[in-house]
Amino acid sequence: LTWPAVAAGWSLAVEQGKIGMALPDIHTGGWAVTGSRADVVSSVNASGESAVIRFNPTSTVATERLAYTDLEQPLLLQDLRTNLSHVTLTLDYGASGTWAERLAMEGEVKIEASRIEHPLLVPQAWSFQGRVKGRLANLRVQGSLVSAAGLKASLDVQLYPDGAVAISVDSAIEGQAGIRALAETFTGWPELLTVDSGSAAVSAEVRMGPGGGLEASGSSNLEKVTGVFNRTAFSGLSGRVLASLEDDRLIAGFRDLTVEQVNPGIPVNAIRFTGDYTGPVANTLEGQLEVQQARAQFLEGALRIPPGVYDLEGSSGGIPVEVQDISLDRLMEVYPAEGLEGSGLLSGRIPIGFSGDGIQVAQGRLSAEAPGGRLRLPAEKLQAMLGGNQAMDVVVQALQNFHYSVLASTIDYDEKGKLTLDLRIEGKNPELRGGQPVVLNVNLEEDIPALLTSLQLSGRVNEAVTKRVRKLLQESGEEAVP
């Protein structure tokens, strides 16, 4: 059966309610739909201006290719199979306009794509089940989306006549299985991030304009997320993260973020953070961080960043971390050397700078709170730290049992991980020179990455980190395979 009123290129075959129909290619608003064919069982009610087709079971439309090419990151769907068993299609073949403006759909659909490609996605099959309503140029699609990796999400898509597209996605991610599905769906998942437990409710909205412009926003509500990133273990991460993309600038908000513990080798506990970030997508270090609240517990004391707006890169003062009453005794306990002892409380201020080369500290300062305390440093360890300088023997002797009233140090840290301490210590050793007052000026250096590696290998973080560090060292040839 041929309908003369239908645009050129259409052919319809009707036999006992069966229709085989080659559909024309559609090009509109950056979208391209090619290689489509309908094989349906239906009832047709036609008039001089339109036809209404009600599809029965086994009705399908196969599409070789659906693409959106007006973006720098194009979207491609291949080998789509759409089940129209419960859909009504209205063809206004007597109306003017494009086919996308003359075709309307309503009903329940099932869609399967053998492969979806996008720079942000791992290429794989996807399936969708939901409802469609509207003309193709102004279509609303709502339902459930599932990736071959197992990621499940609620999807809401609105197409507009000018070619714009609005997409809303919501997903609940639970435990290892949910995280594994997420990692196997998105290309940007960090290779060294492992999540063991917790949950996240994620939502995202994307709008692609007719001219190819992209606006995106999203949020994530985290609940007790625990895992390992690179060599650092974390536990109890909760809170809300907001993000939006506007004119190549990233805007992020962190609301009531809490972390029970972050442990790279020396644990930081009870972290609390609320703030906002704004910066260019191309170089996040050129952005600004507005801190509303930032505090944590560390070595029985506290760390705090004062509220304010800070430039991440190029700021002369860096981001100031205030250190309050950390325990020297606890610090000596976590240091990977036997025989270190100390007492007293340390406070000060450490400005942290960021660059493409890493983290730096310039002229940080720590000092002991009155009335001071006691230091005992083993001679062998101290001599090694001082480089075996025999001229420093008096320092080594004094620090075997030193009662200090003043302990102050500048702190510098470079991009390569070298920590430099310029210490000034005033006090006495009751067993040295009759307990005469002694003033010591000591310069110490420490390789912090090597120190943390030692702590991680000792099992002070957790077994997963120890195994990861050992594997990395073996791969780099720094540690022999046992």
Residue ranges and their predicted role:
Residues L1-V228, G239-D247, I251-F354, A384-G417, ...:
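Extended amphipathic, helix-rich lipid-handling scaffolds
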Residues L345-G373:
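C-terminal structural cap/anchor segments
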Residues G373-L382:
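Outer-membrane beta-barrel and related beta-rich outer-membrane complex signature
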